[in-house]
C-alpha cells in the first residue's frame, strides 16, 4: 500500500465541495480510496487529502490518467486558484493493521518522528499499535514518509471518535505504559503530533 497526502489551506466553504469533485476523478481513474480531514496540532487549521494506491506503479498509472484528463483541470482550476499548498508526502507502511470501517468518519492520532534504527521502529510500532488497540483504537500503522518530510517516520492510530481517543490516551498515561519503553522513546527525535478528523471518505 502507498498513500499520497497533501496538506493545504482553502476557504472552509469550498473544502468539501472541492474534495467531492476531486474524489470522483480519483475513483474514475482507479485509486484505492480518498479522504479529506481537518487537522489539529502540528498542522493546525489545515486540510489534508489522502489518496490510496496499491504501490508506486499504481500511483503512476492513476497520476498519468488524471494528468491527461482535460476535464480534471477544467473542474478543479476554480478550487486550485483558492488553494495554498503546504506539504506533500507519500507514506509507505512497514506495519499496517486497519480493518475496513466503511460508513465511519474516524479520528486519527498521528506522530511524526525520527529514529536511527528502522528495525526497532517496526518492532516498537507493532508493540505500540497493540497497546493502543487494547485501549480502544480500531487500527494502527507505522511507516516512512517520502516527500516534504523525507527521512521522517509516521505512526498513527485510528478511533471512531475523539472521545474514544481521549479515553485511550488517559488510560495509557495513567498506567504509565510508555515509561516501560523509555530507552526507545528517549532516542526519538519528535517532529510533530496532530489529530485528524475525517470529514468525507470513499475508502471501503
Task: Please provide the spans of the model-predicted regions.
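Short S/T/G/P-rich N-terminal loop/turn motif that feeds into the first structured element of a domain
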Residues: 1-179, 183-204
